[in-house]
Amino acid sequence: GGVYECFSADAKEFDAYKYRITRRDGSSVLKSDPYGYHMCTRPENATKVYTLPDFDWTDREYLKKSAGKNVIEEPINIYEVHIGSWQKYEDGNYLSYRAFADRIVKYVRDMHYTHIELLPVSEYPFDPSWGYQVTGYYAPSSRYGTPEDFMYLVNKCHEAGIGVIMDWVGAHFPKDENGLYEFDGSCCYESSDPVMNEHPDWNTRIFDYSRNEVKSFLISNVVYWLKKYHV
């Protein structure tokens, strides 16, 4: 246990890094930073040194107007969409956040939707999971671009009067070695009770909501997305 700190004068923006965790039995494991802002693109899974940009948001009027609405009485029409499967480039590659933004806004407005609901965008390793097996809770998936690119997407939607809802996975997480799973060799984010920590349908671990540290991690993550990305 305890709080640890490390400073590297040689670290540069976009450098990849992991934490080497030494377990009680003497073995070690390499872990991605649970609070990392940007991740390497799969199949790589290291965290990148990254400074969140001072993005030039132009959605102030939308946010002000949205805050004054009665969400119960106002009409709402939500378009749920997965960035990776909605459209692709001709070569089969995923659209970037920016390319997706430029296309989705016109479509949503033409179809008279008020909001888009994005399937999970937090970093995840397995494409067919559609984002529901998160390993980087603070990092928009790098398969579509940078955190700044995701800010562009949200801002573009808000400029057009379109709200952005983000599907958020706060129930369980996968057993990928670099992720939250048995982070220090013991159950840090999940319960140590084998009956309570296993999701039988997904073969994933369930968050232990009885721990204040876990609650803080998840609540802080929600606030982070609201404040930094305006979702």
Question: Which ranges hold each PLM region?
Answer:
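Substrate-binding/active-site clefts of carbohydrate-active enzymes
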Residues: 40, 64-73, 82-230
